[in-house]
Amino acid sequence: MLEDLELKDTPIVILNFKTYLESTGERALELASICGDVADETGVNMAVAPQHMDLHRVSDAVEIPVLAQHIDAVDAGGHTGSILAECARDAGAAGTLINHSEKRMQLADIEWVISRMKELEMMSVVCTNNVMTTAAAAALGPDFVAVEPPELIGSGIPVSRAEPEVITGSVDAVKKVNPEVSVLCGAGISTGDDMKAAVDLGAEGVLLASGIILADSPRDALLDLVSKV
């Protein structure tokens, strides 16, 4: 499934648009286009996770992978208000975030969505909060786990500086459990130094949001982010 996305042999940056007005509607298109341009200019893998209502328009506008922010563990049928995997796929999503700290899921539902992503040949990115949950998530066989200590999310304090042992411990744990799973890190990542430190600690990329979305110049912030990897 990842082979179909034609990811390069470089770190990956996944930008989560969350529900910021700065990354909604037309601004979602602008931000996704910036990510695509930076990916072309630098050779670093980029992916974006816009709000569900923007999935179709964003995926139509860019060549980089577009992910859903969440998919529910439901089949087609009577599940009003739920996000259906097939619907996200048909809207252009190449995969989904799972279990973000702002959208927690039960273990059985996490496993269900990962399995559904495999069936639909879509990418799965499971978010975790510490080494133990990262190891547990890796056992379920997603494509990526993204470890983010929740207290650092949006703080401007990078996990690679505040809690580097979370990254190294997660990388070591995943290698033991399922070496096919790639480890990302997030929480407070916003600069080139932050990302370089994360990669040096063993992460294969980053998941981030506000450090880019709320920057005075998202383009300049992205270029700085990938400038040292």
Curated annotation (Swiss-Prot):
The protein's Enzyme Commission number: 5.3.1.1
Pfam families in UniProt: TIM (PF00121)
Cited Gene3D superfamilies: Aldolase class I (3.20.20.70)
The keyword Isomerase belongs to this UniProt entry's keyword annotation: yes
Enzyme class per UniProt: isomerase
Sorted UniProt keywords: Cytoplasm, Gluconeogenesis, Glycolysis, Isomerase
Residues holding substrate: N16, F17, K18, I153, G188, A209, S210
UniProt xrefs under InterPro entries: Aldolase_TIM, TIM_sf, Triosephosphate_isomerase, Triosephosphate_isomerase_arc, Triosephosphate_isomerase_AS
Subcellular location: Cytoplasm
GO molecular function: triose-phosphate isomerase activity
Pathway terms, separated by semicolons: Carbohydrate biosynthesis; gluconeogenesis; Carbohydrate degradation; glycolysis; D-glyceraldehyde 3-phosphate from glycerone phosphate: step 1/1
Active-site residues, Swiss-Prot/TrEMBL: H100 (electrophile), E148 (proton acceptor)
Single GO biological process annotation from the record: glycolytic process
Reactions catalysed, as given in the entry: D-glyceraldehyde 3-phosphate = dihydroxyacetone phosphate
One GO CC term on file: cytoplasm
Complex formation: Homotetramer; dimer of dimers.
Protein family membership: Belongs to the triosephosphate isomerase family.
Functional description taken from the UniProt entry: Involved in the gluconeogenesis. Catalyzes stereospecifically the conversion of dihydroxyacetone phosphate (DHAP) to D-glyceraldehyde-3-phosphate (G3P).
Name of the protein described by the UniProt record: Triosephosphate isomerase
Species lineage: Archaea, Methanobacteriati, Methanobacteriota, Methanomada group, Methanobacteria
Gene: tpiA
